[in-house]
Amino acid sequence: MALNYLITGGAGFIGSNYVHRLLQRGANVTVYDNLSRAGAPRNLDWLKKDFGADSFNMQVADVRDAASIREAARQADVIVHLAGQVAVTTSVTDPRSDFEANAIGTFNTLEAARLSGHDPIFIYASTNKVYGGMDDVRVVEDATRWHYADLVNGCPETQPLDFHSPYGCSKGTGDQYVRDYARIYGLRSVVFRQSCIYGPRQFGIEDQGWLAWMTIAAVTGRRITIYGDGKQVRDVLHVDDLLDAYDAAIEKIDVAKGRVYNMGGGARNVLAVWAEFGPLLEKLLGRKIEVARAGWRPGDQRVFYADFGKARKELGWEPKIGLEDGIERLFRWVQENQALF
């Protein structure tokens, strides 16, 4: 029998890609989204074009509305909670809205799951920002990047949480509540502390989704500003690999419930945000890219890459799409869909 999925933020980048995958399988899907992001209507159009307007249930609503999310969750077998405020910079300028969307919105969604009486699986998209600046970890500067001096495989889940920036705090609140609902209420919940996720259907902007944003800006001739020294290192993970991890956790929920997993490309898929990504982008574009420079932004880690060994051991998961292959796929999608931007 087909499972009933509730995807909050289902019209967003990760959400729409997962909805597409689920509809291909014949799942029953409810997309729950407030459509506040510019790309959301375009992602819905894509889903309707591929599967038909009646292929999924659409609820235009906000997770800050406890009554609406409780109603949406009543029959859900799986809840994938992706909705929220996603930019560190926005959290600094408007911390109240950030807290309401991420902390209260996640609490409302957890309560909806708990009170449904349906024992749903609950997947939560957390963030590596919960680790904060990792000031106790030594980093080393090379010609094109910063890197960890001692964490050869990257940051493990045992790294102390430090919650820098209002965004890190609000997502961290959700992170800890999701874990505790597994302990206290037996909710079958899983936390994924996600690194930089990228891929098609990502309408990146300067404040969030840097890899997609720079690709879109380069292809469409928009100005790119590099903040900090451009050597900040991130591990990048293609969205298809992330969705494989969601699938693995759902399939192995007896193992995964109550667990936290770092979810990123790991040490083999790291990239300096401009010192290394810039030349790759220029090669794909076939020309030099002029950029502006500005100072460091709040909460911007010099280094982050995840040790995903726990997910590999417990879920049998690891990334399949290499960095250069994935970036080339994203570049081609942007080139072929310039009218969307």
Set out the residue ranges of the language-model regions.
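N-terminal Rossmann-like NAD(P)+-binding domain of SDR-like oxidoreductases, especially those catalyzing
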Residues: 1-197, 317, 329, 337
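C-terminal substrate-binding subdomain of Rossmann-fold SDR/epimerase-dehydratase oxidoreductases
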Residues: 18, 61, 196, 216-341
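Activation loop
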Residues: 40-43, 87, 207-210, 214, ...
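Short aromatic-enriched loop/helix-cap "lid" or pocket-rim segments at secondary-structure transitions
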Residues: 41-44, 133-138, 202-206, 273-276, ...
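A conserved pocket-lining segment of Rossmann-fold NAD(P)-dependent short-chain dehydrogenase/reductase
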Residues: 91, 150-165, 189-203, 213-237, ...
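Non-catalytic, surface-exposed connector residues within folded enzymatic/regulatory domains
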Residues: 92, 124-125, 191, 204-208, ...
